[in-house]
C-alpha cells in the first residue's frame, strides 16, 4: 500500500486564484487566532458608524415634525378660532362635545345611574350568520 504524506494539501497561490479568494483564505486562516480583531472589532465599528450616520436622520425627522407643529401667536390663534378676544372664555364650543370635569364629579354622575335595571337585547344578525341559539 502506498504511504500518504502527513502534510495537508494547500492550493498554490497562482495567478489563477483571484485576489478575493486569497484575502478570504487569509481571513479564514487568521480568524481562529484573532477572533476579536477580525470579527468583533469590525462588528463594533459598524454599529458605532451606523449610530453616527443615523443621528442626523433622526434629527431631520424631529425638525420636520417641529415645523408642522409650532406654537401659535395670539393673532394666529384668533384667526383659527382657537381663542376669543377675551381669552378662552370667548370661545363658542360644540354643545354636544362632552368635556369631563374632575374625577369626583364623573364618579358621582356614574353612581347616579341605575345599573340594576337593565334588559339584555339580542343584536340582529346578518343573513346566514349563526345566531348562537341551539
Curated annotation (Swiss-Prot):
Gene Ontology CC terms, in alphabetical order: mitochondrial inner membrane
Pfam families attached to this UniProt entry: COX16
Protein's membrane topology: Single-pass membrane protein
InterPro entries, sorted: Cyt_c_Oxase_assmbl_COX16
One GO-annotated biological process of the protein: mitochondrial cytochrome c oxidase assembly
Subcellular localization: Mitochondrion inner membrane
Presequence extent in this chain: 1-23
Principal location listed in the UniProt entry: mitochondrion
Keyword presence, Transmembrane: yes
Keywords on record: Membrane, Mitochondrion, Mitochondrion inner membrane, Transit peptide, Transmembrane, Transmembrane helix
Transmembrane segments: 35-55
Function: Required for the assembly of the mitochondrial respiratory chain complex IV (CIV), also known as cytochrome c oxidase. May participate in merging the COX1 and COX2 assembly lines.
UniProt family annotation: Belongs to the COX16 family.
PANTHER family in alphabetical order: CYTOCHROME C OXIDASE ASSEMBLY PROTEIN COX16 HOMOLOG, MITOCHONDRIAL, MITOCHONDRIAL OUTER MEMBRANE PROTEIN 25
Designated name of the protein: Cytochrome c oxidase assembly protein cox16, mitochondrial
Species annotation: Aspergillus clavatus (strain ATCC 1007 / CBS 513.65 / DSM 816 / NCTC 3887 / NRRL 1 / QM 1276 / 107)
Organism lineage: Eukaryota, Fungi, Dikarya, Ascomycota, Pezizomycotina
Amino acid at each position: 500500500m502506498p504511504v500518504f504524506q502527513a502534510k495537508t494539501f494547500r492550493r498554490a497561490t497562482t495567478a489563477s486564484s483571484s485576489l478575493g479568494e486569497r484575502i478570504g483564505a487569509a481571513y479564514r486562516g487568521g480568524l481562529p487566532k484573532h477572533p476579536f480583531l477580525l470579527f468583533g472589532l469590525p462588528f463594533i465599528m459598524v454599529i458605532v458608524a451606523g449610530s453616527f450616520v443615523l443621528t442626523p436622520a433622526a434629527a431631520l425627522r424631529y425638525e420636520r415634525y417641529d415645523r408642522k407643529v409650532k406654537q401659535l401667536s395670539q393673532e394666529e390663534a384668533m384667526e383659527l378660532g382657537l381663542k376669543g378676544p377675551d381669552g378662552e372664555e370667548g370661545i363658542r364650543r360644540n354643545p354636544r362635545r362632552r368635556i369631563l370635569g374632575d374625577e369626583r364629579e364623573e364618579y358621582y354622575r356614574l353612581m347616579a345611574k341605575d345599573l340594576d335595571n337593565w334588559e339584555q337585547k339580542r343584536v340582529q344578525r346578518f343573513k346566514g350568520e349563526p345566531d348562537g341559539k341551539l
